[in-house]
Amino acid sequence: EAEKKFKGFIDLVVYSKKDEKIHLIDWKTCSWGWKPQKKSDKIMAYQLVYYKHFYARKYEVDPKDIDCHFVLLKRTAKPGKKAEFVRVTAAKKRTTDALNALTKALHNINKENYIKNRIACTNCKDRFGTCEFYQTKHCL
């Protein structure tokens, strides 16, 4: 398979003397916050898992010394509650799972085997207009 290169942008990297850890931060804007399902969504978390894995590899840092967080920037929240930290754990098992998912995705892309997101398709039937491919020749 062909070699692939990725470019990612970590919004903020902070070293804390207090806990002697590097904190990788990704800003997310939202109106009010996230529901618990979104906070625990593994695919969403994989973004930070990849950041941690590749940051540790590039800078030769022990992954145990890196913590990851989404910071929700809430547009409609009350003053003093406009930001919320959502910690994302990225232990060995989750990192292995994320890297396996990436390998599988790259394999399918290289084979031009594009997999339909049937969850989004099911939802779009109830909310007409949210999927640009709904009821077209591209909707399988």
What is each PLM-predicted segment?
Residues 41, 53-140:
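Metal-dependent nuclease catalytic regions and adjoining charged, substrate-binding loops involved
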Residues 1-48:
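Non-catalytic protein-protein interaction segments used by genome-maintenance enzymes to assemble
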